Amino acid sequence: SKWTDKHEVIQGSRFDYDGGPFYWQYDFIVPLGIPNPIAPAAFGPAGYRVMDTLCFEGGLFNRRVVTEIGLPDPRFFIYWDDTMYGYRASKVTNPIVVPDVILRRTREIGNWDIAGVRQLNSTSDMNRYHIMRNRGYMARYFMTYGDFRPLVFGLGTVLTAAKEVIRLVMVDREHLKTGLVQIAKGWWDSRKLMHDPTWKPMPSLK
């Protein structure tokens, strides 16, 4: 295809459940460890955007990249796993997101519409826990690649927690009490992961 001839990691676009374009946060602010919510949606003159993250839904990988960086890390279980796989891939190639639509959401999800520009979607307490806990694994990979900045990453964690509290208040208020508990528990457990002496990154397949 016109993309696979020159690019090794490709992310297709998608439609939202209502048939409109689904905005996917392709720009990952590595020092903070958070997606950039205001990255331009347009693809520009090149017809694609270089990215440093990924979504497993619709992601296409060249075998060379997988061999080089290894398999996705199953310890994440859910959340940030594909983000960090895209980050790892960006260390050996330039992943891109393209305008070709390959997926469409079919389930409506409760959300808070932010000025008609972005949406904050409903999620589960299990997700809330892993959003916070898995920042521990994220930090370990940043350490592995020399990108870990403790103070800036700590700020990113505070911003992530604040976003989840806002999500609880604006979208998932019926889970406010249990949600706050899971955010705090995940944050606590992330600290333990950051200092786990037995942790090792996923190995290369070479």
Q: Where are the predicted features?
A:
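A conserved mid-domain beta-alpha-beta active-site/ligand-binding segment of alpha/beta enzyme cores
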Residues: 131-141
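A short acidic, glycine-rich active-site loop
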Residues: 117-129
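Conserved donor NDP-sugar-binding/catalytic core segment of glycosyltransferases
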Residues: 1-27
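A recurrent flexible, glycine/aromatic-enriched loop bordering the glycosyltransferase active site
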Residues: 40-61, 119-122
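Non-catalytic, C-terminal membrane-associated alpha-helical segments of glycosyltransferases
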Residues: 143-206
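A short, conserved alpha-helix in the catalytic core of glycosyltransferases
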Residues: 59-70, 75-101
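A structural signal for well-ordered alpha-helical segments within the folded catalytic domains
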Residues: 83-84, 126-133, 181, 185
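Active-site donor/metal-binding and catalytic loop motifs
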Residues: 98-119
